[in-house]
Amino acid sequence: MIRIFAVCGMGLGTSAILKSRLREALDATGADYQLDVSDASAISGQRADLVFTSNELAERMGRLSARVVVINNFMDREEIRRKTADAVAAFE
């Protein structure tokens, strides 16, 4: 099972939007996954395989052992689908 987090800077609002888009993309891959949300300050205490976040926050996550995937536009389903498929393929 792949442990995945959607991370935003201030709380759960934008990460909930990203989580919804990620769920669509992950379901299309057929991967076995667990998807949660976190804010940037709390992610370092989580065990994760993949972290999806914005470019601004990705710079703060250099110390994570998880692979960080940058999403430029949380509303762009195609970008999320493509980057999710690429990230999940690394676990196959």
Which role does the model predict for each range below?
Residues A42-S44:
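Structural alpha-helical scaffold elements that stabilize or flank donor/cofactor-binding regions
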Residues I2-D39:
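Conserved active-site segments centered on acidic
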Residues L35-D36, A48-S54:
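Short, hydrophobic beta-strand segments that form beta-sheet elements in well-ordered domains
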Residues A40, T53-E59:
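Short, polar loop motifs at secondary-structure junctions
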Residues I2, R67-E92:
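Ser/Thr/Gly-rich flexible loops in soluble cytosolic domains mediating phosphotransfer, phosphorylation
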Residues G13, E59-R60:
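Short glycine-rich, flexible loops that bind phosphorylated cofactors or substrates
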Residues Q46-R47, L64-S65:
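Short, structured coil segments at secondary-structure junctions
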